[in-house]
Structures are given as C-alpha cells and as structure tokens.
Amino acid sequence: MVTYIVFVLSIIFVISFVGVSSKPSPIYGGLGLIVGGGAGCGVVLSFGGSFLGLMVFLIYLGGMLVVFGYTTAMATEQYPEVWVSNKVVLGAFILGLVVESLIVIYALKSGEVKIVFEFDGLGDWVIYDTGGSGVFSEEATGIAALYSYGVWLVIVTGWSLFVSVVIIMEITRGN
C-alpha cells in the first residue's frame, strides 16, 4: 500500500513540474513548485525520513515562498495569464500530461518500470534489527540506499533543482 502511495506522490510530483515548465504566469509557476516540493517531502516521509522531510519542507519551501512572494509582488498582473490563454502553453501542458499518463499506464500494466522503480523486491530496503538500541541508524541506511538503489532519484532531483534555478532566473529577469 505504501508503494502505491509513493507512486501517486511521484505522479503528483511530476505533474506539478510539468505545470512549472509550462508556466504562463509566475503565480502558477510558484504554485507548481510548492505542490512538487510538498509531494517530494511526502515521498521522503513515506520512507521513514521524518527529520529529513521536515527539514526539506521548512527550509526549501520556506525559501521558495519568500522568493516567489517577492517575484509575484514584482510581476503582478491585473489579469494573469493561465494555461488555457495560450494554445502553445496549453499544448505543452497537455502533451506532458499525456506522456506522464502513458508512463503510469505502462507501469501499472507491467508491474514495474525497469529503469527507475520496481514494485516487487523491496526487501533490500528493510532493516533487520532486534529492537532496542540497534547498530543501524535509519537515516544512514536511507542515505546508503539513496545512492545505491536510488541513483535515478538523485539524478532526477539534481535535474529538478537545476530546472528550478533556471525558472527562478527566468522569472526574475523580467521582459
């Protein structure tokens, strides 16, 4: 059940960044980043990293709220452009949603996406401990699993941060 919750949060994460990449107005771009950050924190929390998820939520989203609050105040429009006001932007948004939907359908029909994520064989992530004060720390094991099994997660996270910086530079640059 948790696997499917993470799967749904990952879908929300990707769809929010599709919305960011086809942003018509800074308000909606910031909203997409906030939703994507919240979904990413939900994924971190579902794997037991409560402290890490809380820190990401407080620091990353707090900083984003300040930046996007400032840029929204500087670029306020009386009638902000929405996704349906420009046919090219709407087409890019719908194309991204269709591609994401096809990936989801493929993953649900085959049971796995071989490159990124498998729905079976997650026993490697389980920490076998007898209880009490164990030898293994959950956070350290999570970091080891992130860099061994989650190499694609690290790549996607780095790419997302790069795209976020480019979008922030584009928003603050102006006309």
Swiss-Prot record:
Assembly mode: Core subunit of respiratory chain NADH dehydrogenase (Complex I) which is composed of 45 different subunits.
Gene3D superfamilies listed in its UniProt record: NADH-ubiquinone/plastoquinone oxidoreductase chain 6, subunit NuoJ (1.20.120.1200)
Enzyme class per UniProt: translocase
A Pfam family recorded for this sequence: Oxidored_q3
Bilayer-spanning residue ranges: 1-21, 25-45, 47-67, 88-108, 149-169
Keyword NAD: yes
Enzyme Commission designation: 7.1.1.2
Alphabetical keyword list: Electron transport, Membrane, Mitochondrion, Mitochondrion inner membrane, NAD, Respiratory chain, Translocase, Transmembrane, Transmembrane helix, Transport, Ubiquinone
GO molecular function: NADH dehydrogenase (ubiquinone) activity
Signal sequence interval, chain numbering: none
Lineage, uppermost ranks: Eukaryota, Metazoa, Chordata, Craniata, Vertebrata
Species of provenance: Balaenoptera musculus
Subcellular compartments: Mitochondrion inner membrane
GO BP terms in the entry: mitochondrial electron transport, NADH to ubiquinone; mitochondrial respiratory chain complex I assembly
Free-text function comment from the UniProt entry: Core subunit of the mitochondrial membrane respiratory chain NADH dehydrogenase (Complex I) which catalyzes electron transfer from NADH through the respiratory chain, using ubiquinone as an electron acceptor. Essential for the catalytic activity and assembly of complex I.
Protein name per the record: NADH-ubiquinone oxidoreductase chain 6
InterPro entries linked: ComplexI_Subunit6, NADH_UbQ/plastoQ_OxRdtase_su6, Nuo/plastoQ_OxRdtase_6_NuoJ
Cellular compartments per GO CC: mitochondrial inner membrane
Membrane topology term: Multi-pass membrane protein
UniProt KW Electron transport keyword: yes
Catalytic activity annotation: a ubiquinone + NADH + 5 H(+)(in) = a ubiquinol + NAD(+) + 4 H(+)(out)
The organism's place on the tree of life at top rank: Eukaryota
Family, as annotated: Belongs to the complex I subunit 6 family.
